[in-house]
């Protein structure tokens, strides 16, 4: 099966993509995984190191074709503050818990978490449940995909309860198309893959 061995970051490619893969936040963190695009193109993501893929990135196949990464909508909490100072205070509390957080102009977005929802409401925030792509801040030590224009990526986990507190998230998500199946692609970082509802449950974490 053809492999995707490199990544081009957002705005670093102009050619038409041969296909696209629809991936949630967890699924955009994988090093090696069998995938099928929305138009049926099957390939194996086979990168050298872990890197966070973002919507708009392109996976480069061995024959030069590109596969666009599309960030899937998923269940989120949008946290709204009364003023900028309040927003900074809320962001501090989320950061203190090492929660992946997407910073918007006037709000914050996190994965749905009832405990955190209760906490920020207690701090005076307004919380709204939404469905949207999740693109959190990478953190001081994150390795962005554009830094990996060659081949550096890893990790991507589908569905089920993924905990990441300090890296702890709680995700319950499913997509049927542009999906990633693990198809038991094994390497030294991968234990075993479970193909389940068009999602990968693999264990090659960062």
From Swiss-Prot:
InterPro entries annotated for this entry? Answer: UreE, UreE_C_dom, UreE_N, UreE_N_sf
User: Which is one GO molecular function term here?
Assistant: nickel cation binding
- Signal sequence coordinates: none
Q: Which GO terms describe its cellular component?
A: cytoplasm
Q: What's in the keyword line of the UniProt record? A: Chaperone, Cytoplasm, Nickel, Nickel insertion
Q: Which domain of life is it from?
A: Bacteria
Pfam families registered for this protein in UniProt:
UreE_C, UreE_N
Q: Which SMART domains match?
A: UreE_N
**Region annotation Disordered: where it falls in the sequence:** 136-206
List localization entries.
Answer: Cytoplasm
Q: Which Gene3D superfamilies match?
A: Urease metallochaperone UreE, N-terminal domain, UreE, C-terminal domain
BP GO annotations? protein folding; protein-containing complex assembly; urea metabolic process
For bias kind Basic and acidic residues, which ranges apply? 148-169, 177-191
List all Basic residues biased stretches: 192-206
Q: Record's family?
A: Belongs to the UreE family.
Q: What does this protein do?
A: Involved in urease metallocenter assembly. Binds nickel. Probably functions as a nickel donor during metallocenter assembly.
Q: What is this protein called in UniProt?
A: Urease accessory protein UreE
Organism, by scientific name, is Bradyrhizobium sp. (strain BTAi1 / ATCC BAA-1182)
């Amino acid at each position: 099966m053809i492999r995707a061995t490199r990544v081009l970051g957002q705005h670093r490619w102009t050619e038409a993509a041969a296909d696209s893969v629809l991936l949630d936040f967890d699924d955009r963190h994988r090093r090696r995984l069998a995938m099928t695009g929305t138009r049926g193109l099957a390939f194996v993501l086979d990168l050298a190191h872990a890197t966070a893929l973002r919507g708009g990135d392109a996976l480069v196949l061995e024959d030069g074709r590109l596969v666009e990464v599309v960030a899937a909508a998923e269940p989120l909490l949008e946290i709204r503050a009364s003023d900028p100072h309040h927003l900074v205070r809320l962001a501090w509390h989320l950061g203190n818990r090492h929660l992946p957080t997407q910073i918007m102009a006037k709000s914050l977005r996190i994965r749905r978490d009832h405990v955190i929802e209760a906490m920020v409401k207690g701090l005076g925030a307004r919380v709204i449940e939404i469905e949207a792509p999740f693109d959190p801040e990478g953190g001081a030590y994150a390795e962005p995909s554009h830094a990996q224009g060659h081949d550096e990526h890893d990790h991507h986990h589908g569905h089920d309860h993924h905990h990441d507190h300090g890296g702890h998230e709680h995700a319950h998500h499913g997509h049927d198309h542009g999906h990633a199946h693990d198809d038991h692609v094994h390497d030294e970082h991968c234990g075993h893959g479970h193909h389940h509802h068009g999602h990968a449950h693999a264990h090659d974490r960062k």
